[in-house]
């Protein structure tokens, strides 16, 4: 049996942005086409199907229904675990959008509790977001499980949320009994020991620029996984001056950031030609105008990320979850600005 595995979808992201929705539709179509060619009728989605925790719009609800119907028409059953973005409250499993909006469909199976599922003789644990309410239940399930494989929405230490941005979280030792652990939650692909973060099926922000995205096929008979890259990297970063010959059509309908390290007479034309085809264009100057200093006085230097975190931690009268979200957002902006 072959299973298609897909990371976080984040339906409704950026206030139901139509361009992002087009990216998601394109990715779903690619996955369906691959499934049809390879006889796949089972998908596992790794949580965060939805993006906005507390205000899912009618447009997002409609979009989710259309996707589920498209999957049903293709003969595909979707297994999905509940991620933190699917929850109304971060530390309580209910209410959650996946259960409320998707569980009613016959071809969708929502997992809001740790569950061992038999996929043609291959036992896989499907484990939702671990929070204050269900930590004991999840740890006990893992301790007594006979499954060799685990799908989760884990927040583990030492992996990467975005390329270049290391995560903080639980040490992954409690998962060592599994042969392989696959996880959503972090958006870039990374792995260590028996844990692999599979990444999102498509790029969503500038923090994803030039970062491979796609989906994964797992064969329960051979226990082999294969990465199938998305045909399009929707967020691209290029450097100017551009080395070699550029075909501007390659950037049609993409979000492009140009890092300028030198200004010459052709820069204006370069920007103009890109503007004709791209979805959005950002030009960032990285020209080094620094001047060497003879000042030998020692100065204590802290990283910008450390300073941002200290500033956010000093903000009064905000909840711990809001503080954590602000730090994560600030780190994301830092990655976008420095890559």
Curated annotation (Swiss-Prot):
Gene3D superfamilies: 3.60.21.10. The keyword Transcription regulation does not apply. Keywords: Bacterial host gene expression shutoff by virus, Degradation of host chromosome by virus, DNA damage, DNA repair, DNA-binding, Exonuclease, Host gene expression shutoff by virus, Host-virus interaction, Hydrolase, Nuclease. One of its GO terms (molecular function) is exonuclease activity. One of its GO terms (biological process) is DNA repair. Its EC number is 3.1.11.-. InterPro entries: Calcineurin-like_PHP_ApaH (IPR004843), DNA_Repair-Maintenance_Comp (IPR050535), Metallo-depent_PP-like (IPR029052). The keyword Hydrolase applies. To phage T5 protein D12 and to yeast RAD52. Consists of two subunits: gp46 and gp47. Exonuclease that plays a role in viral genome replication, DNA recombination, and host DNA degradation. PANTHER family: COMPONENT OF ATP-DEPENDENT DSDNA EXONUCLEASE (PTHR30337). This is Exonuclease subunit 1. It comes from Enterobacteria phage T4.
